[in-house]
Design a protein with these regions (language model features):
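Gly/Thr-rich phosphate-binding loop signature of adenosyl cofactor/nucleotide-binding cores
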Residues: 2-91
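Structural motif
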Residues: 65-67, 98-99, 162
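Glycine-rich nucleotide phosphate-binding loop and flanking beta-alpha elements
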Residues: 73, 105-106, 160
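Residue-level recognition of alpha-helix initiation/capping sites
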Residues: 81, 103-105, 145
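Charged, amphipathic alpha-helical linker segments immediately N-terminal to NTP-binding catalytic cores
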Residues: 94-97, 101-139
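Pre-Walker A adenine-sensing motif
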Residues: 142-154
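Glycine-rich phosphate-binding P-loop
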Residues: 157-164
């Protein structure tokens, strides 16, 4: 009987995610590296479009947030005062990090607000849905249950066998 038990990872840090997946996902850190110790607690991605309008009842704050064309277009439609207010409301939720898809330009106040709340911001060349799909797969691997077994591997008639 095995004494090993499957262990599901309860969280990973933003720094771990960035270090392990930056190349595959085309991630580039924007601004300071503060906040890389923040925890990602869910292996899924959120697009905070509805939250930007002020509706936070079901905001998925444990997830990586992604701005695509729709979110950035909405932000560009706001005057400077409203933009700052909306960004302050969003960043005050202390989500793990923000990813800007399509290498889209961002309002300067977005990076300023991220720095104020020490929230890492990344940029990727990938289109939004391709990034979300690839990042979700990467996160599922990071959060997958794992187990450790101690023993020796031997070859018995061409079949690998673990002897505990």
């Amino acid at each position: 009987m095995s004494t090993a038990a499957a262990h599901r990872v309860p969280h990973i840090t933003v720094g771990h995610f960035y270090a392990n997946h930056a190349e595959t996902l085309g991630l580039r850190l924007e601004g300071a590296s503060r906040g890389l110790n923040r925890k990602i607690r869910e292996p899924t991605i959120n697009r905070p479009g509805l939250a930007l309008t002020g509706f936070y009842n079901y905001f998925a704050g444990k997830r990586i947030q992604v701005f695509g064309s729709a979110e950035l277009s909405y932000l560009r439609s706001l005057n400077a005062t409203t933009l700052k207010e909306k960004l302050r409301q969003l960043f005050s939720r202390n989500f793990p990090c923000l990813v800007i898809a399509r290498n889209s330009p961002t309002p300067g106040s977005l990076l300023d607000m991220a720095a104020e709340f020490e929230t890492p911001v990344f940029r990727t060349h990938m289109i939004t849905m391709k990034f979300i799909n690839a990042a979700t797969i990467a996160l599922e691997f990071d959060f997958a249950p794992s187990t450790q077994e101690y023993g020796s591997m031997v070859d018995i008639q061409g079949i690998g066998t673990l002897i505990r």
